[in-house]
Design a protein with these regions (language model features):
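C-terminal "cap" of GNAT-fold acetyltransferases
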Residues: 116-130
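A short, internal acetyl-CoA/4′-phosphopantetheine-binding micro-motif in the GNAT/acyltransferase core
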Residues: 55-65, 92-94
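Conserved GNAT acetyl-CoA-binding A-motif
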Residues: 80-93
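Active-site rim helix/loop that mediates acceptor-substrate recognition in acyltransferases
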Residues: 1-20
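Conserved acetyl-CoA-binding loop-helix of GNAT-fold acetyltransferases
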Residues: 59, 65-78, 106
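Glycine-rich acetyl-CoA-binding "A-motif" of GNAT/NAT acetyltransferases
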Residues: 22-25
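Conserved acyl-donor/pantetheine-binding loop and adjacent beta-alpha core of acyl/acetyltransferases
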Residues: 28-56
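Conserved active-site alpha-helix within GNAT-family acetyltransferase domains
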Residues: 70, 94-113
Length: 130
């Protein structure tokens, strides 16, 4: 929970979905120039002068496959925070997160590179020019 609070404080865009006071979904994003140590954030920092990195997205299990992820991404894509910047995200490919890979491709993200982080983990880097 402390890590999540830290990320929210560092974020330049975040959105939360609530039902009856309970958070059922969230998205946390960061612009360039943040002190974020994530190797994935650092990857995009080296590639772009201006970007918005999608760091965390979550939907509560009971609310999966209801379009909430698409709703949050659509809200982000049409926000002033994402105008004239490249939206950046990474998705695990080892272990494979096929639903997320397909989701990002469906909404227009393009695969730019895959990177082996260690013997257990590999990620795919995606970008959307907004």
């Amino acid at each position: 929970l402390d890590v999540l609070k830290e990320l929210i404080a560092m974020s330049s865009y975040n959105s939360f979905l609530e039902i009856d006071g309970e958070i059922i979904g969230f998205i946390i994003c960061m612009r360039e120039g943040r002190a974020h140590k994530s190797p994935n954030y650092q990857y995009f920092k080296k590639r772009h002068k201006h970007f918005l990195y999608i760091d965390r997205v979550g939907v509560k299990q009971d609310f999966l496959n209801m379009g909430l992820g698409a709703y949050m991404y659509n809200k982000l894509i049409h926000s002033d925070d994402s105008k004239e910047v490249i939206l950046c995200a990474e998705v695990n490919t080892k272990p494979e997160n096929l639903p997320s890979i397909n989701f990002h491709k469906k909404i227009g993200f393009k695969l730019v590179e895959k990177k082996q982080l260690n013997i257990y983990n590999e990620v795919a880097y995606f970008e959307l020019i907004n």
